[in-house]
Amino acid sequence: MGNTTIPTQSYRAMESGQSKSYIIPFALLCSLFFLWAVANNLNDILLPQFQQAFTLTNFQAGLIQSAFYFGYFIIPIPAGMLMKKFSYKAGILTGLFLYACGAALFWPAAEVMNYTLFLIGLFIIAAGLGCLETAANPFVTVLGPESGGHFRLNLAQTFNSFGAIIAVVFGQSLILSNVPHQPQEVLDKMTPEQLSAWKHSLVLSVQTPYMIIVAIVLLVALLIVCTRFPSLQSDDHSDSAQSTFFASLTRLMRIRHWRWAVLAQFCYLGAQTACWSYLIRYAIEEIPGMTAGFAANYLTATMVCFFIGRFTGTWLIRRFAPHNVLAIYAFIAMLLCLLSAFSGGHVGLLALTLCSAFMSIQYPTIFSLGIKHLGQDTKYGSSFIVMTIIGGGIVTPVMGFVSDAAGNIPTAELVPALCFAIIFIFARFRSQAATN
């Protein structure tokens, strides 16, 4: 089908003189990007902590990520319906409420040492984050002149990258360092009472960090309640602006660039999760004498590369066509994955680490390109794009399967390389559409 657009009224601010009133709302929206990065990246801290505290198998520990993926996957459509009926602001406040409730559940869960209760809390947090992403990503895009939408979203996502780094430091200092992990020989010498007390102390170490998060989330929610956001025509609830979910979906399915964006975002989130999930194992397998503790430094380095890449990418998008920048970044990421697949060793590990710099701008750029010209269907359109986070839960095990079949990790890097190739095709398609 052709690249269909929907003739609707402008999706921008209703009053041209409101540009100055965007500053405070935009700053608050940027804080949301920071907040959901903190919650997402703390999962990597919780996983080893809970695995020791609850004596979990790898599968049971993996339920932490499953709870997140499932929460993210099911909430965007209800969130889109909520915003369709009310406003972006209502979606944001709902997301912050769920975020705070889920984080608050960590206190009683730690007191009673109940892993299931933690998973419920994580699911509620993820539902809140899914709601925030569904609202904040398109809101940032439409909050101002259309020409600056790509730049604003990439700038806001820079705070997301910063939040990821802060989460690792925050988690290491307040969770991992609070109660030192003990080697198995030390644990074997403990009495049952001592072992139980030590395990409980591991779980209790999450209480203070998550209560700090609750306080910050509630403070941001209060600031948003007290802040007047610019009036957007997308929040007009007249009958002419309303449409049912299925009618909206029918229109969306006719829009070629939106369909491609959904596929590209699925591939991106799958590639990102897979690359980061297997980075430490890649280092241990390919570098003789490499320990898991030292290999974790490479994961930290990927976060720094990701932040630098997003910062410089945001500058590039301000000066060049976003789809062209996306095409270049996706192509380089693909080449680096291929290099890590065929070279191995220090060269492959370095390539995999640097790859994060070129992942950086892909999510926000795919998102903003995907929702462009969707008009009244933007809220549902963005909901489906947010749902593609399930790609992380599908591509990662596929990469694991390839690794098991090949007998090594490097060969499995062909999987994210294929994902980046699809993103490159999407970017080139958007480039051709822009020139026609």
Ranges and model annotations:
Residues 43-47, 167-168, 172-178, 251-300:
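Extracytoplasmic gate region of multi-pass secondary transporters
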